[in-house]
């Protein structure tokens, strides 16, 4: 399954590959064949990058799930930061059930998402009003293709694990944790959107 709004990318690279193949067959020029193989590789890469595998999120009102696939790069100040490398699935999911209170897009720079100054990068901040309080999900653009795509609107009711958007080609997602939750992950952990529990309500035992 491909991510939402990825069809134009796939159509573009497939069309380009078809053009180079036709030109290579008709001309037999080595350079054109080289361009064909490069575009074929690009086609496979784009399809692989925009993959959107099915995920099953357990029903749990006392759990918060990772909003992104990747590695936990920081856990501090009631915030969990997940860095998504280029090989990770880039579709993001809501960490908790609730209603979308606001979506704010902020312009900024395009430093690598793991850089200490990436706090100034372009970002989209989604505030979700849950039964446990407000949760901020911040999608931060990286250094490559700088596009944050949102699948949701203000007023939407979300269920934990529901898709909320994606960031293209390397990025980071930060999630704030309510005070009545204990953080259940640590720096270096590999997490999966909608599947890995990153926080749980205090005195609540997560079922394995």
Swiss-Prot record:
Pyruvic acid (Ser) found at: 171
Reaction it catalyzes: archaetidylserine + H(+) = archaetidylethanolamine + CO2
Alphabetized InterPro entries for the sequence: PS_Dcarbxylase, PSD-A
Keywords: Cell membrane, Decarboxylase, Lipid biosynthesis, Lipid metabolism, Lyase, Membrane, Phospholipid biosynthesis, Phospholipid metabolism, Pyruvate, Zymogen
Post-translational modification (record): Is synthesized initially as an inactive proenzyme. Formation of the active enzyme involves a self-maturation process in which the active site pyruvoyl group is generated from an internal serine residue via an autocatalytic post-translational modification. Two non-identical subunits are generated from the proenzyme in this reaction, and the pyruvate is formed at the N-terminus of the alpha chain, which is derived from the carboxyl end of the proenzyme.
Compartments reported by the entry: Cell membrane
Active site: 171
GO biological process: phospholipid biosynthetic process
Pfam families: PS_Dcarbxylase (PF02666)
GO cellular component terms attached to this protein's record: plasma membrane
Membrane topology: Peripheral membrane protein
Cofactor comment text: Binds 1 pyruvoyl group covalently per subunit.
Site (Cleavage (non-hydrolytic)): 170-171
Top-level EC class: lyase
Cofactor: pyruvate
Broad class of the protein's primary localization: membrane
E.C. number(s) listed in UniProt: 4.1.1.-
Gene Ontology MF terms: phosphatidylserine decarboxylase activity
Family recorded in the similarity comment: Belongs to the phosphatidylserine decarboxylase family. PSD-A subfamily.
Stated role: Catalyzes the formation of archaetidylethanolamine (PtdEtn) from archaetidylserine (PtdSer).
Binding partners and assembly: Heterodimer of a large membrane-associated beta subunit and a small pyruvoyl-containing alpha subunit.
Official protein name in the record: Putative archaetidylserine decarboxylase proenzyme
